[in-house]
Amino acid sequence: MSYEALFSPFKVRGLELKNRIVLPGMNTKMAKNKHDIGEDMIAYHVARAKAGCALNIFECVALCPAPHAYMYMGLYTDHHVEQLKKLTDAVHEAGGKMGIQLWHGGFSPQMFFDETNTLETPDTLTVERIHEIVEEFGRGARMAVQAGFDAVEFHAAHSYLPHEFLSPGMNKRTDEYGGSFENRCRFCYEVVQAIRSNIPDDMPFFMRADCIDELMEQTMTEEEIVTFINKCAELGVDVADLSRGNATSFATVYEVPPFNLAHGFNIENIYNIKKQINIPVMGVGRINTGEMANKVIEEGKFDLVGIGRAQLADPNWITKVREGKEDLIRHCIGCDQGCYDAVINPKMKHITCTHNPGLCLEYQGMPKTDAPKKVMIVGGGMAGMIAAEVLKTRGHNPVIFEASDKLAGQFRLAGVAPMKQDWADVAEWEAKEVERLGIEVRLNTEVTAETIKEFNPDNVIIAVGSTYALPEIPGIDSPSVYSQYQVLKGEVNPTGRVAVIGCGLVGTEVAELLASRGAQVIAIERKGVGTGLSMLRRMFMNPEFKYYKIAKMSGTNVTALEQGKVHYIMTDKKTKEVTQGVLECDATVICTGITARPSDGLKARCEELGIPVEVIGDAAGARDCTIATREGYDAGMAI
């Protein structure tokens, strides 16, 4: 497909965009100590610009020392201007354009713990401070011009300070900045005027806004949203960047939508607003394919399309779409583990990506080796395949030894759960990528100490993965007791009343899978059902369990199993009251976790032979796939 609409030019004031694709502002956490731009941030943006992105919008910047959340870059000193100028110069040299997102967090940065993990109670803003903040937005816009940016964006969504003023659910002021719709909009109108008056007439002005204000006690109506955007357009806003979500309700999930939400879930909501406003629209929301991106432009539903996490997963997404090589795209799977979870986890230095562990490491490049080595990779899961791909690309000779009859076994199983087809597709994609690169694979091959000696590799990477952790429960060998793997592999399909023991990440998905097939499921967990799930995944669990009518038994220890019965002790979380009981069921599925597959013998043999060896992924200890693939990437780069 040529995707003519997607790759048609677009002009906003004096800015000529070569196509309709924008990299929206997304937090990377790469700002150094809140004040410096390093080679990693520059390389990240340059890579997307070289691939053909029409406009990169730099992540939100703090406009004053407080609040200045620990992961954001600042824009309130000459030093910030100098640092950001390095970035814009590099992107311009690469043929791209740069915008910047002007931001004030209000109470929302308190969600993101600082380095000391402390929280503070936010204060009510004085009118004097409101006027200062308006001036700070104006100063930030002026500094953005000095730093060489081609466009500015005002972030007025997602429960940040501007949205807190706009929403009747958050704005409880009784002065000129609260109460009536006009008063609630006053702060934003003043900010828009301050920004417009501090940038050149030919400089485009974007504004991020919510196309729906929802799931709070009081929200902006559709009419209010339309009126607000049209008034901002009169005051100088050129493009409405329409998103969805807030930080005070379940609507948080719409900001960084996980796999539970359909691709393009927000298209019609955005189009509904577009039809009622007087300026062009940029839209976002799990738009991951060239076909979908082209369609929203072709049908007039968007004027510009934000391709965000798809460009995190593959910096060359645009090149591959333009050249008709979409089968080579590393697709985002909506796991949110490397992007969203990393942002809210202060222990993570920067974002990463399950499918693209080289994210934020673009500055390293992929240096070719001048001493090719024969590398034995024991295990063909995601970590092993990523390691092999990196090694092959760098000029080494990796060989994958896989005990089963196919690659990506565990990740394929992850794709069996409801709404996770993308995961299964990625498992298949990785297997095909190994084949495309010409990497030798030996399936149905169990590696022993003797195998290593016979193969005589220069290096060994052990990526044998994990195995089922079977708890010591009397009666666990009863005929009606099955493992998570038996269910996910399709070896069994328990029906009727089914107890699922161990409801962390895998257990909740097994519970939903069986319930979707008609089983009456009871989810049993020693701690709390859903323990270990990411924040957004936990938010989806309750409505999904309600939809599937899955019963939950948290704080429950299983003491024994027998045919058709589960014996348990339950501790009430609030009262600490302990009760014993017997649950009658037709089948029981054990999902109590995984443990590293034994590999000490292989490692010891390598050491005896003097062969450099590294253990990665689940083989080094149970971990999520994002960490495993990053370890595979690092192992491939280290040789």
From Swiss-Prot:
Binding site for substrate: H155, A156, A157, H158
Protein residues bound to FAD: Q337, A383, E402, Q410, K420, V447
Pfam families referenced in this protein's UniProt entry, alphabetically: Oxidored_FMN (PF00724), Pyr_redox_2 (PF07992)
Annotated binding of FMN, by residue: Q101, R208, R286, G308, R309
SUPFAM superfamilies (UniProt xref): FAD/NAD(P)-binding domain, FMN-linked oxidoreductases, Nucleotide-binding domain
GO biological process: bile acid catabolic process; lipid catabolic process
Native organism: Clostridium scindens (strain JCM 10418 / VPI 12708)
Pathway the protein contributes to: Lipid metabolism; bile acid degradation
Similarity comment: In the N-terminal section; belongs to the NADH:flavin oxidoreductase/NADH oxidase family.
GO molecular function: 4 iron, 4 sulfur cluster binding; FMN binding; metal ion binding; oxidoreductase activity, acting on the aldehyde or oxo group of donors, NAD or NADP as acceptor
Purpose of the protein: Stereo-specific NAD(H)-dependent 3-oxo-delta4-cholenoic acid oxidoreductase involved in bile acid 7alpha-dehydroxylation.
Binding positions for [4Fe-4S] cluster per the UniProt entry: C332, C335, C339, C353
Entry protein name: 3-oxocholoyl-CoA 4-desaturase
Cofactor: FMN; FAD; [4Fe-4S] cluster
Catalytic activity: 7alpha,12alpha-dihydroxy-3-oxochol-24-oyl-CoA + NAD(+) = 7alpha,12alpha-dihydroxy-3-oxochol-4-en-24-oyl-CoA + NADH + H(+); 7alpha-hydroxy-3-oxochol-24-oyl-CoA + NAD(+) = 7alpha-hydroxy-3-oxochol-4-en-24-oyl-CoA + NADH + H(+)
Domain of life of the native organism: Bacteria
Residues annotated as catalytic: Y160 (proton donor)
Annotated keywords: 4Fe-4S, Bile acid catabolism, FAD, Flavoprotein, FMN, Iron, Iron-sulfur, Lipid degradation, Lipid metabolism, Metal-binding, NAD, Oxidoreductase, Steroid metabolism
Protein EC: 1.3.1.115
InterPro entries to which the protein is assigned, alphabetical: Aldolase_TIM (IPR013785), FAD/NAD-bd_sf (IPR036188), FAD/NAD-binding_dom (IPR023753), NADH:flavin_oxidoreductase (IPR051793), OxRdtase_FMN_N (IPR001155)
One GO CC term on file: cytoplasm
